[in-house]
Amino acid sequence: MMITRDQALQILYEFTKSENLRKHALAVEICVAAYARKFGEDETKWSVTALLHDFDYEMHPDAPDHPMKGEPILASRGIPEDIRRAILSHANYSGVPRESALEKTLFACDELAGFLTAVSLVKPGRSVHEVDAKSVRKKMKDKAFARSVSREDMVNGAADLGVDLDEHIAFCINAMQARAGELGLGGAPSQTTTT
């Protein structure tokens, strides 16, 4: 039985009350779903996986509990094993190696989506439309900025996915720009004029 996106959202909202965590799940979903379309994969399955990857984080914010203790909850809700495995694999300490394209994509998009959100929020218009790969790479060098986001995971995620880091950053920015309003990162696309 395949779960729908709406059912995944219901589970996410049941267990995740923080608006920021909900938006993080949505940002990761947006990036992962864009890759599903690019790779010709099952967009619903990939979206569901991304939406649920941190559903248990408020209950179990520390390693190794997250996502291990959430997995039985998802199993009891009928979430397919391949989705649960991908969710487990997004945690480096889980011992579950990332093998499938879904698993690699989820890992590659998780930290990056959070970082792109953080970069967007420090822009004057608080908008993802003001973000580009160059500004993201510059912020990656600032260890005090979004210090909880692993730069190593962002770099390794792109490498494991077989994608150039700058291309990966730009791809995810473009995906998030298309749905910026849902993320609270809409602002307005910047207008440039030449004189």
Predicted regions and their residues:
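Acidic/His-rich, divalent-metal-binding segments that scaffold phosphate/diphosphate chemistry
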Residues: M1-D62
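Conserved active-site and cofactor/substrate-binding residues in soluble primary-metabolism enzymes
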Residues: I3, Q7, K23-A27, D65, ...
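Non-catalytic terminal extensions that flank enzyme cores
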Residues: R5, T194-T195
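Predominant activation on well-ordered alpha-helical scaffold segments within soluble catalytic domains
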Residues: L9, Y13, L26-E29, A33, ...
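C-terminal binding/interaction regions
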Residues: T16, L116, V128, K134-T192
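Residue-level detector of short coil/turn "hinge" positions at structural boundaries
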Residues: E19, E43, P80-E81, R147, ...
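Divalent metal-dependent catalytic cores for phosphoryl transfer on phosphate-bearing substrates
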Residues: F39-K143, V155
